[in-house]
């Protein structure tokens, strides 16, 4: 069992470490995404700098990384002994501190969502709905991401799912830390917005006065 756990942790970290946006940008679009837009290698910056198709692919793969990592205990039939969330946590670690990107990485949002998908698909749907609602309200991917992960942490506390609460709490801290520059921009009214939603409408209306 010990070696199985170590093996799952290593695989989870390596899966999470795959810098999807960086590699797609470099090998398909011949662009270094780290030098474009926000410089982040995650989904949002991929959408903004490489386009819709690339963004969708990166989103799918980054979610899949978390799902596959957290599904390992199910594959091995030991999910009753080894909690999938604890294994999946190492995928988010890999995503933010990637061995393939000089220990830099993304903001862990999509990969964390993938972990939740493997563990509890219903909560994954809830998180997605919250994300979409906040995105339509604020027009800010960063705000939607932080609210979405925070909501899962609060829900886990409410339903007494303690391991989920611990993992979601850790990931909430990671997501907020990785979004610290976004938080400063939100507070100063300078955060980037998607071109739809109430926040975008109000900003455009204000600027066009």
Curated annotation (Swiss-Prot):
Chief place where the protein resides: membrane
InterPro entries, sorted: G3P_acylTferase_PlsY
UniProt subcellular location: Cell membrane
UniProt GO BP: phospholipid biosynthetic process
Catalysis performed (reactions): an acyl phosphate + sn-glycerol 3-phosphate = a 1-acyl-sn-glycero-3-phosphate + phosphate
MF annotations from Gene Ontology: acyl-phosphate glycerol-3-phosphate acyltransferase activity
One cellular-component annotation, GO: plasma membrane
Membrane topology according to the record: Multi-pass membrane protein
Keywords attached to this entry: Cell membrane, Lipid biosynthesis, Lipid metabolism, Membrane, Phospholipid biosynthesis, Phospholipid metabolism, Transferase, Transmembrane, Transmembrane helix
Family to which the UniProt record says this protein belongs: Belongs to the PlsY family.
NCBIfam families associated with the record: glycerol-3-phosphate 1-O-acyltransferase PlsY
Known function: Catalyzes the transfer of an acyl group from acyl-phosphate (acyl-PO(4)) to glycerol-3-phosphate (G3P) to form lysophosphatidic acid (LPA). This enzyme utilizes acyl-phosphate as fatty acyl donor, but not acyl-CoA or acyl-ACP.
The protein's assembly and partners: Probably interacts with PlsX.
Protein name in UniProt: Glycerol-3-phosphate acyltransferase
Gene: plsY
């Amino acid at each position: 069992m010990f070696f199985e756990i170590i093996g799952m942790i290593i695989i989870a970290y390596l899966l999470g470490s795959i810098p999807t946006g960086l590699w797609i940008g470099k090998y398909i679009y011949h662009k270094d995404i780290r030098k474009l837009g926000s410089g982040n290698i995650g989904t949002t910056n991929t959408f903004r700098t490489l386009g819709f198709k690339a963004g969708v692919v990166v989103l799918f793969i980054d979610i899949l990384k978390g799902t596959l990592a957290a599904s390992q205990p199910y594959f091995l039939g030991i999910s009753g002994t080894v909690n999938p969330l604890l294994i999946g946590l190492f995928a988010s670690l890999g995503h933010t501190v990637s061995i393939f990107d000089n220990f830099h990485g993304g903001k862990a949002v999509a990969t964390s969502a993938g972990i939740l998908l493997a563990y509890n698909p219903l909560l994954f749907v809830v998180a997605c709905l919250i994300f979409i609602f906040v995105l339509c309200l604020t027009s800010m991917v960063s705000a939607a991401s932080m609210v979405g992960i925070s909501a899962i942490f609060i829900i886990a506390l409410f339903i007494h799912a303690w391991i989920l609460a611990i993992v979601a709490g850790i990931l909430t801290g990671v997501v907020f830390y990785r979004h610290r520059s976004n938080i400063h921009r939100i507070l100063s009214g300078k955060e980037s917005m998607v071109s739809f939603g109430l926040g975008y409408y109000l900003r455009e209306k204000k600027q066009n006065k």
